[in-house]
Amino acid sequence: MMKRFRLLSVFAVAIVAIGTLLVSCSSDDDKQEPNTITNNKGTYKITSAYIMDLTDQYSITLTAHPGNGVKATILKTDIGKRIDLSKRGRWKADSPTVVANGEVETLQSGSYVHVKSYANGQISISYCLKKSDGNGSRMEKGNYSGSIRYGTFQNP
């Protein structure tokens, strides 16, 4: 009887965890505070934003303290498009929570980067990164709308 109860308990926890991952990134900015990054450690205010021109791509870095941030690299032609990170492509995502290179791997369904606009030193971006592997399930999401500096290399 105890084995059955224990198995049911583990199964219930797994269902709740999977359900949380599936709905966590359901929409661009559902219940996400403006200009923040949220991961399994908490929610952090974005303190700076940088963009680098890499010929046919942009590398966008959003930093938040302490030690949180994200760097997304996308094609310039993808500005205004929602990029599905569960499909291969010329994109990269790098954060302390999730790292992926779209040319060699993909992220879980529901993962995306959406640079809604970039012009005149202003940017609007939202993203959700979900990955499950031998290290467990991880999720990070964020959004930022505001000024962005053209800069040199920045670690997230």
Feature locations, PLM:
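Bacterial Sec-dependent N-terminal signal peptides
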Residues: 4-5, 17-45, 150-156
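Intrinsically disordered, low-complexity serine/threonine-rich segments
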Residues: 12, 29-30, 51, 98
